[in-house]
UniProtKB/Swiss-Prot annotation:
This is Fimbrial protein PapE. Overexpression of this protein in the absence of chaperone PapD leads to proteolysis of itself and CpxP; degradation requires both cpxP and degP, as well as the N-terminus of PapE. Strains of E.coli that cause infection of the human urinary tract produce pap-pili (P pili) which are hair-like appendages consisting of about 1000 helically arranged subunits of the protein PapA. These pili mediate binding to digalactoside-containing glycolipids present on the epithelial cells which line the urinary tract. It is found in: Secreted; Fimbrium. GO terms for cellular component: extracellular region; pilus. Keywords: Cell adhesion, Fimbrium, Secreted, Signal.
Length: 173
């Protein structure tokens, strides 16, 4: 009887300990999503002021260098910028209501910066790395260039104010 009693205690103790493992269920879940946030881009205006129509060229002149300020909370790796516009022609922004012909008008060509000078043409809708980025930590400034040109017949251009918009999105990868 003593043998059975001595054997029962370890068997019962083992059953109790094992039953705790059997009843254990994963009841805590930890989840989320890691993201790299886009930069917050400040509004930028490039003002050509008065441009005489006869001084325009179809391929673009009246070059302006401009800067875009932004705050990038995540700034590790390589900055990628994408510029898009609603009205485009041949990789330029087509400025609406600047010609007597609706499909023609003033064009804005965009270029990357190359060590402060005009660089390669920017392909709208395609990410690129800015050639000139300045700033520390999260506060960044990129330099770009723009030129004015036109599509169609110069005689069809309409004198008056002009305005076009584009969207610039920047993030690091």
């Amino acid at each position: 009887m003593k043998k059975i009693r001595g054997l029962c205690l370890p068997v019962m103790l083992g059953a109790v300990l094992m039953s705790q493992h059997v009843h254990a269920v994963d009841n805590l879940t930890f989840r989320g999503k890691l993201i790299i946030p886009a930069c917050t881009v400040s509004n930028t205006t490039v003002d050509w002021q008065d441009v005489e129509i006869q001084t325009l060229s179809q391929n673009g002149n009246h070059e302006k260098e401009f800067t875009v300020n932004m705050r990038c909370p995540y700034n590790l790796g390589t900055m990628k910028v994408t510029i898009t516009a609603t009205n485009t022609y041949n990789n330029a922004i087509l400025v609406q209501n600047t010609s007597n012909t609706s499909s023609d008008g003033l064009l804005v060509y965009l270029y990357n910066s190359n060590a402060g000078n005009i660089g390669t043409a920017i392909t709208l809708g395609t990410p690129f790395t800015p050639g000139k980025i300045t700033g520390n930590n999260a506060d960044k400034t990129i330099s770009l260039h723009a030129k004015l040109g036109y599509k169609g017949n110069m005689q069809n251009l309409i004198a008056g104010p002009f305005s076009a918009t584009a969207t610039l999105v920047a993030s690091y990868s």
